[in-house]
Amino acid sequence: MERTVVVAITEGLHARPAALFAQKAGAQPVPVQIAKTGGDPVDAASILGIMTLGASVGDEVVLRTEADGDDATAALDALVEFLSQEAVA
């Protein structure tokens, strides 16, 4: 199962946004990977992995999980929602 989303976070996935995203991904009931479109996937719960993506505002990323069912859907929905925000708290 996968979802594609455009990063709306003004700072992109760097430093604090990357840490918050990794924390949110790690709290999900299923493992999730993230990749820039056409790039290699990394563990979405890994701050360093996320930072190596170099995803900036406007970049398209793919979120993917091997899981199925409601947990997988909810996990991807939550992470898409996070990336769709312009600012993170």
For the regions a language model picked out, list residue spans one by one.
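Intrinsic-disorder/low-complexity, polar/charged segments enriched in Ser/Thr/Lys/Arg/Asp/Glu/Gln
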Residues: 1-4, 60-62
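Broad hydrophobic/π-residue packing in well-ordered secondary structure
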Residues: 1, 27-28, 86-87
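C-terminal structural segments of small proteins and small subunits
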Residues: 51-89
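Compact, glycine-rich, soluble single-domain proteins
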Residues: 6-49, 53-56
